[in-house]
Curated annotation (Swiss-Prot):
Belongs to the SecA family. May bind 1 zinc ion per subunit. InterPro entries: Helicase_ATP-bd, Helicase_C-like, P-loop_NTPase, SEC_C_motif, SecA, SecA_CS, SecA_DEAD, SecA_motor_DEAD. This is Protein translocase subunit SecA. The gene is secA. Its main location: membrane. Residues 855-891 are annotated as: Disordered.
Length: 901
C-alpha cells in the first residue's frame, strides 16, 4: 500500500526513465524541419560525417538525437513510414542496454533500425538476432533499402552457408541471423585449425528480437556440437522390450491404487524412479534377455551404463508423448519445441533419451553423440560488449533479466490506447465439457463475422479441437509443427471475417494478424497486377476490415493456461494491435496439466460440493487468482532451475574461456617452438622425478624403469645405465641435463629432415588436435560429475562448492595431460622426408575441412564431427572395449575409463 502511494507521488522507475527520454524525443522532433530540406545526397552524407565525429572522440550518446532523426527522415523517403515518438523511445531503450517491452503491432522491426544504425557507425558490427531463418531473412530484406540508402551494408547469416559467405555476412555493418546460428558459429570458430577458418569478428552489439523466447525459454538448452560415439542401438532395443512389463505406482489415496507398482513418476520434476519391486523385476528381465549375468545388481559399478539405459527407456515411455513432445516423420523422431510448437529439425535429446524414444517408436536408432563443444545461450550472449532486446511480453520476467543478464526492462507505452477486452477464465470439471463450450463460443462469434484464433499448448490438443470443429461443420485452419510451410500464409489471413485458426502456442510469432486479412498477400498471388486490380483489392479489403471492426475485432480463445503467464499474454497480444478492438478468454478444466499438478485438489472438491452440473463453469476472481498463483509457482521453479544451471555452467564457462583464449592465441601465432621447448622441459622433469626423486641417494634410483618409460612414451632409447657405469661422477642434475639434451638433439635431427617451417606447422597441428581431444573428454567427465554431484548434499557438503573444487582439479589434470600427450606425440612421430609431413598436414587439413562441411551441411544442434580420425593421427593407442584398462585398475576398459570416452 505504502509503495503504491509513493509510486503515485514520485512515479515508478519506468515513468522516470521515459520522462528523461521524452526530452530527447523533443530534441529529435526539433531537428525534423531542417533534415526535410536536405537532398538525398546530403542526407546520405550524414553517415560519413557521424563516423568522422566518432573517430574524433565524440560518443554515441552525443550522436543519438541527430542519428535517430536521420534514420526517421530516411525511412520517410524510402518506405513512406515515419517512426512514431514511442518507436524513438523504444530505440533509446535498446541503445541503453535495456529490454524494451513493446506490444504486438507497435512496429518492433522498424524500431530496431534506430539503434542498429547508431551502433553500426562504430564499424564493429551489429548482430540482430531472431528466432528463425524466415524472420531473419524477412527483416533483413524489409530493412535493407533503408540501411543501404544510408550507406550501411546488410547481410543475413543463414544455416548451411559456406564459410566464405559467412565471413562476408559477419563483415557487414548489420548482420541478421538466428540465435542458434550465431552460437554455433562461435563454437565452430573455436574448433578452427587456422585463423582463416574463423568467420566471426569480436562480439560487439547484439539486438535480440523476441528476447524472452531466446534468453529465457531457450536458456536451459545448451548448444552442442558433437561427434559420433560408439554404437549401442541393440542395447536400446533390448531394454525397450522390458518397459511394457512395468506397472506405474499410483498415489495411495487415488481411485486406481492397487498396491506397490514398479516405478513412480514425479510430474513436477519430470522424473521417474524404480521402486524396490520394480528393481527386482527389471533385474530378472535383464537376466532373461541375456544383458546381465545372474546374481549381478543393476546398481553395481559395472552396470552404471545399463542403469542409464533403463532410466532413459522408462522416461521415453512415461514422460514423452508422441505429437506432444515429438512427432515421427519419415522414420525420424523430431522434437517439438514446448514453447513455440515448432519442430526442431536436427535437434536431439542428450543422455541417450533420443535413442530410447527411437527404440520406443520402432524407427532406426541413430548413434549416440559425444560432445565436442558446447555453450548455453546465457553464456553466449553475455560475451557481447553490449546487449539489448525487445519483446511484447517481458515485464513478468523483469527480475530474471535483471539478475542474470543485468538488463533492466522498460515498458514502452503504446501509440494508441489498448481497448481489448480480457474476459475472466471459465473453469469446467472435464475436458469434454470445456471443448463443447469452446465450440459454442466459436459458433456464436463466427455467426456475426468475427475472426477467432484458438491457442493450444500441443499438437495433440490442436488436433482434438480440429476434430471437434470438423464434427460441428466449422471450416478452420490448423497451424502447428506438422504444417510448418504454410505458417505465414495462414497467420496473414487469420483476420478474415469469420475465419477460425487453431495455433499451437506461439507458432507464427513475428507475423501480424491484419483485421480483414492481408491485401498484400492477395496482390502477391497475382502475376504483374495492374493499378486498377490493386485498387479493387484494397477497396474489398477496406470493406472486410470495417466489417471485422464492427463485429468486435479478433477474438482469442485459450484452451488451457500455459506454465508461464508470459506465453498466455503473448497469445492475448495477437488481438487489439494498434488500438484495434478485440477480446480474449481462457477455457480451463480440472483435467488440464497445470490444474492437475499445481492447483490443489481443494478446487476440484469445492466444485463437486457446489453441486456443479455437467456443462456448468465456475467464473470467479478467486479461481483466476489461484491459477495465477499456480503459474507463479511454476515460473519461480523454472527460474530456479535456470539459475542453478547457470551457476554450474559458469564454472565450465571460466574453463571454456581459458581454453578458447589459449586456442585463439595458438592459432594467431605462426611459431610455437618456444612453447613446445618449455613444455618439453616440464614433461621430462616430471618423468625423471618419478624415477629419480630429487635429492635422493643413487640406491633409490629406478634406472631400468626410466629407460623403459623414455622408450615407450617418447621413443627415446638412451643407455642411461651404461652412462652411469662409465661415468661414476654423473650426478642427478647432470644426468637430467644430458637426457634433455639428447631429446632435443633427436628432435633437431627430425627438423633438419623436413625443414623448420614444416615442423612448426606440424607442432601447431598436434597441439590443437590434442587440446581438442582432451577438451572433449573433459566435457564428458564434467557431465558425469554434474549428474551425480547433488548426492554430496547428503554428506552435509555444498554440491556447488564440491563441483567447483573437483572440476578445477580435473581441469588442472587435463592441462598436465595436454603437456604430456603433445610431447609424447611429436617425439614418437617418425619423419623421414618432407613429403611425409606434408602428407600428414594435408590429411589433417582435409579432415578439418570435412568436419567444417559436415557441420555446415547439418546446421543442427547435434553436428557431426569425425573424432576417431583425430586419435589415429595424433598417434594415440586405440584400446578395445573389452581390453584391460590402461590405468591399471584391472577392470575392462568399457567399465573403467572407457565410460568417459
Amino acid at each position: 500500500m505504502l509503495i503504491k502511494m509513493l509510486t503515485k507521488v514520485f512515479g515508478s522507475r519506468n515513468d522516470r526513465t521515459l520522462r528523461r527520454m521524452r526530452k530527447v524525443v523533443a530534441l529529435i522532433n526539433g531537428m525534423e524541419p531542417a533534415l526535410e530540406k536536405l537532398s538525398d545526397e546530403e542526407l546520405k552524407a550524414k553517415t560519413a560525417e557521424f563516423r568522422a565525429r566518432l573517430e574524433k572522440g565524440e560518443t554515441l550518446e552525443n550522436l543519438l538525437p541527430e542519428a535517430f532523426a536521420v534514420v526517421r527522415e530516411a525511412s520517410k523517403r524510402v518506405f513512406g513510414m515515419r517512426h512514431f515518438d514511442v518507436q524513438l523511445l523504444g530505440g533509446m531503450v535498446l541503445n541503453d542496454r535495456c529490454i524494451a517491452e513493446m506490444r504486438t503491432g507497435e512496429g518492433k522491426t522498424l524500431t530496431a533500425t534506430l539503434p542498429a544504425y547508431l551502433n553500426a557507425l562504430t564499424g564493429k558490427g551489429v548482430h540482430v538476432v531472431t528466432v528463425n531463418d524466415y524472420l531473419a531473412q524477412r527483416d533483413a530484406e524489409n530493412n535493407r533499402p533503408l540501411f543501404e540508402f544510408l550507406g550501411m551494408s546488410v547481410a543475413v547469416n543463414m544455416s548451411g552457408m559456406p564459410a566464405p559467405a559467412k565471413r562476408e555476412a559477419y563483415a557487414a555493418d548489420i548482420t541478421y541471423g538466428t540465435n542458434n546460428e550465431y552460437g554455433f558459429d562461435y563454437l565452430r570458430d573455436n574448433m578452427a585449425f587456422s585463423p582463416e577458418e574463423r568467420v566471426q569478428r569480436k562480439l560487439h552489439y547484439a539486438l535480440v528480437d523476441e528476447v524472452d523466447s531466446i534468453l529465457i525459454d531457450e536458456a536451459r538448452t545448451p548448444l552442442i556440437i558433437s561427434g559420433p560415439a560408439e554404437d549401442s542401438s541393440e542395447l536400446y532395443k533390448k531394454v525397450n522390450k522390458i518397459i511394457p512389463h512395468l506397472v506405474r505406482q499410483e498415489k495411495e489415496d487415488s481411485d486406481t491404487f492397487q498396491g506397490e507398482g514398479h516405478f513412480s513418476v514425479d510430474e513436477k520434476a519430470r522424473q521417474v524412479n524404480l521402486t524396490e519391486r520394480g528393481l527386482v523385476l527389471v533385474e530378472e528381465l535383464l537376466v532373461k534377455e541375456g544383458i546381465m549375468d545372474e546374481g549381478e545388481s543393476l546398481y553395481s559399478p559395472g552396470n552404471i551404463m545399463l542403469m542409464h539405459h533403463v532410466t532413459a527407456a522408462l522416461r521415453a515411455h512415461v514422460l514423452f508423448t508422441r505429437d506432444v513432445d515429438y512427432i515421427v516423420k519419415d522414420g525420424e523422431v523430431i522434437i517439438v519445441d514446448e514453447h513455440t510448437g515448432r519442430t526442431m529439425q536436427g535437434r536431439r535429446w542428450s543422455d541417450g533419451l533420443h535413442q530410447a524414444v527411437e527404440a520406443k517408436e520402432g524407427v532406426e536408432i541413430q548413434n549416440e553423440n559425444q560432445t565436442l563443444a558446447s555453450i548455453t545461450f546465457q553464456n553466449y550472449f553475455r560475451l557481447y560488449e553490449k546487449l539489448a532486446g525487445m519483446t511484447g511480453t517481458a515485464d513478468t520476467e523483469a527480475f530474471e533479466f535483471s539478475s542474470i543478464y543485468k538488463l533492466d526492462t522498460v515498458v514502452v507505452p503504446t501509440n494508441r490506447p489498448m481497448i481489448r477486452k480480457d474476459l475472466p477464465d471459465l473453469v469446467y470439471m472435464t475436458e469434454a465439457e470445456k471443448i463443447d463450450a469452446i465450440i459454442e463460443d466459436i459458433k456464436e462469434r463466427t455467426a456475426k463475422g468475427q475472426p477467432v484464433l484458438v491457442g493450444t499448448i500441443s499438437i495433440e490438443k490442436s488436433e482434438v479441437i480440429s476434430q471437434a470443429l470438423t464434427k460441428a461443420g466449422i471450416e478452420h485452419n490448423v497451424l502447428n509443427a506438422k504444417f510448418h510451410a504454410r505458417e505465414a500464409d495462414i497467420v496473414a489471413q487469420a483476420g478474415y471475417p469469420g475465419a477460425v485458426t487453431i495455433a499451437t502456442n506461439m507458432a507464427g510469432r513475428g507475423t501480424d494478424i491484419m483485421l480483414g486479412g492481408s491485401w498484400q498477400a492477395e496482390v502477391a498471388e497475382l502475376e504483374a497486377p495492374s493499378e486498377e486490380q490493386i485498387a479493387q483489392i484494397k477497396a474489398d479489403w477496406q470493406k472486410r476490415h470495417d466489417a471485422v471492426l464492427a463485429s468486435g475485432g479478433l477474438h482469442i480463445i485459450g484452451t488451457e493456461r500455459h506454465e508461464s503467464r508470459r506465453i498466455d499474454n503473448q497469445l492475448r497480444g495477437r488481438s487489439g494491435r494498434q488500438g484495434d478492438p478485440g477480446s480474449s478468454r481462457f477455457y480451463l478444466s480440472m483435467e488440464d496439466a497445470l490444474m492437475r499438478i499445481f492447483a490443489s485438489d481443494r478446487v476440484a472438491n469445492m466444485m463437486r460440493k457446489l453441486g456443479m452440473k455437467p456443462g456448468e463453469a465456475i467464473e470467479h476472481p478467486w479461481v483466476t487468482k489461484a491459477i495465477a498463483n499456480a503459474q507463479r509457482k511454476v515460473e519461480s521453479r523454472n527460474f530456479d532451475i535456470r539459475k542453478q544451471l547457470l551457476e554450474y555452467d559458469d564454472v565450465a564457462n571460466d574453463q571454456r574461456r581459458a581454453i578458447y583464449t589459449q586456442r585463439n592465441e595458438l592459432l594467431d601465432v605462426a611459431d610455437i617452438s618456444e612453447t613446445i621447448n618449455s613444455i618439453r622441459e616440464d614433461v621430462f622433469k616430471a618423468t625423471i622425478d618419478a624415477h629419480i626423486p630429487p635429492q635422493s641417494l643413487e640406491e633409490m634410483w629406478d634406472i631400468p624403469g626410466l629407460e623403459e618409460r623414455l622408450k615407450n612414451d617418447f621413443d627415446l632409447e638412451l643407455p642411461i645405465a651404461q652412462w652411469l657405469d662409465k661415468e661414476p661422477e654423473l650426478h642427478e642434475e647432470t644426468l637430467r641435463e644430458r637426457i634433455l639434451e639428447s631429446a632435443k638433439e633427436v628432435y633437431a635431427r627430425k627438423e633438419e629432415v623436413v625443414g623448420a617451417e614444416m615442423m612448426r606447422h606440424f607442432e601447431k597441428g598436434v597441439m590443437l588436435q590434442t587440446l581438442d581431444s582432451l577438451w572433449k573428454e573433459h566435457l564428458a567427465a564434467m557431465d558425469y560429475l554434474r549428474q551425480g554431484i547433488h548426492l554430496r548434499g547428503y554428506a552435509q557438503k555444498d554440491p556447488k562448492q564440491e563441483y567447483k573444487r573437483e572440476s578445477f582439479a580435473m581441469f588442472a589434470a587435463m592441462l598436465e595431460s595436454l603437456k604430456y600427450e603433445v610431447i609424447s606425440t611429436i617425439s614418437k612421430v617418425q619423419v623421414r622426408m618432407p613429403e611425409e609431413v606434408e602428407a600428414m598436414e594435408q590429411q589433417r587439413r582435409e579432415e578439418a575441412e570435412r568436419l567444417a562441411q559436415m557441420q555446415q551441411l547439418s546446421h543442427q544442434d547435434d553436428e557431426t564431427a569425425a573424432a576417431a580420425a583425430l586419435a589415429e593421427q595424433t598417434g594415440e593407442r586405440k584400446v578395445g572395449r573389452n581390453d584391460p584398462c590402461p590405468c591399471g585398475s584391472g577392470k575392462k576398459y568399457k567399465q573403467c575409463h572407457g565410460r568417459l570416452s
